[in-house]
């Protein structure tokens, strides 16, 4: 059978289900595919394949579906640890999330943890599905649970009062038992997701940034840096900044090459070589970035949310303490940094996720939501995301 062409007519949005174990995330995912995509049964989604991201193995199920307005790629994880890893590594980028809460239980510990993680890793918007409403006969009790969920969201700086909450039953939708809380609820949920979760800005429309992977000197032409354009567009003749590791400097791009062909521009996703005016081979290195002037700044101190690998995942065998000094791998290079743990946290065990402060020995072009790996001598021992820049 011929592979069907991916039609890029609708805006594309990445989304995922989050929430406490057994509250119905996977059943809801199955129910959405039933009405908006190729139906995937619970067992097909639950048997999530393993994948590797930043040296960490994560089980994630990917499904796709579409509404009249948009095309969605949806991730669902079988285990709680997979969620933590997924959100911190950005293995599955989320432009928005559907928080599933069982009406019978109300918010539970992982409900809280997933909301906090969504806040820390910068998930822009959440829509709530209050599941299993058929198990609650008391309307006042339902209202109480809804109130609790709104308060919890507000506590973590989401607009709890405005977030859409749809009540229903994923099981009813899968079994066609009660249309009002089944199919109707799932359709209402997706119209709220269409309305409330913003369409992300396409990478090509953002400010130009390219991490430098390699530097060459071409006799008679000057210095060429290669890398994959992360976002935006760079045109021949444009002025750009070289940011990170050393003091920021400006130069002009005098040529762009791709597959040995000359282009007039390079854009997000392209692997290019950029010829730079008046830059010495020694004056630029891997780990710096080329960027639109003023769009990104170098920093050494930041707050991070990190996941530390277990021994079985190839991580450390022992805990670490404040003043731990691993390498932080940003984009294309390792930089040594010193870790300060939050007050009340004596040590971090393998398998923990932790908030920590980091101070790098040289500055890196950095912004909030930037991901990194934590390494010891080239071996990945953790993954993290910049939650706040300090200086």
Swiss-Prot record:
Superkingdom as given in the UniProt entry: Bacteria
Please state where this protein is localized.
Cytoplasm
Q: State the coiled-coil residue ranges.
A: none
Instruction: List the disulfide bonds in this chain.
Output: none
Instruction: Output the Pfam families linked to this UniProt entry.
Output: GTP_EFTU (PF00009), GTP_EFTU_D2 (PF03144), GTP_EFTU_D3 (PF03143)
Ranges where the record places region G1: 19-26
What Enzyme Commission number(s) appear in the record?
Answer: 3.6.5.3
Record region (G3)? 76-79
Q: Which reaction is this enzyme known to catalyze?
A: GTP + H2O = GDP + phosphate + H(+)
Looking at the record, the residues that make up the tr-type G domain are 10-201
Its GO CC terms? Answer: cytosol
Per the record, which residues fall in region G2?
Answer: 55-59
Q: Where is this region: G4?
A: 131-134
User: Which keywords label this protein?
Assistant: Cytoplasm, Elongation factor, GTP-binding, Hydrolase, Magnesium, Metal-binding, Nucleotide-binding, Protein biosynthesis
Q: Where does Mg(2+) bind?
A: 26
Q: Where does GTP bind?
A: 19-26, 76-80, 131-134
Q: What is its main location?
A: cytoplasm
Q: Which InterPro entries match?
A: EF-Tu_GTP-bd, EF-Tu_GTPase, EFTu-like_2, EFTU_2, G_TR_CS, P-loop_NTPase, Small_GTP-bd, T_Tr_GTP-bd_dom
Q: Where is this region: G5?
A: 169-171
Report a single Gene Ontology molecular function.
GTP binding
The family this protein is said to belong to: Belongs to the TRAFAC class translation factor GTPase superfamily. Classic translation factor GTPase family. EF-Tu/EF-1A subfamily.
Q: Which HAMAP family match?
A: EF_Tu_B
Q: What does this protein do?
A: GTP hydrolase that promotes the GTP-dependent binding of aminoacyl-tRNA to the A-site of ribosomes during protein biosynthesis.
Q: How does it assemble?
A: Monomer.
State what protein this is by name.
Elongation factor Tu 2
Q: Which gene produces this protein?
A: tuf2
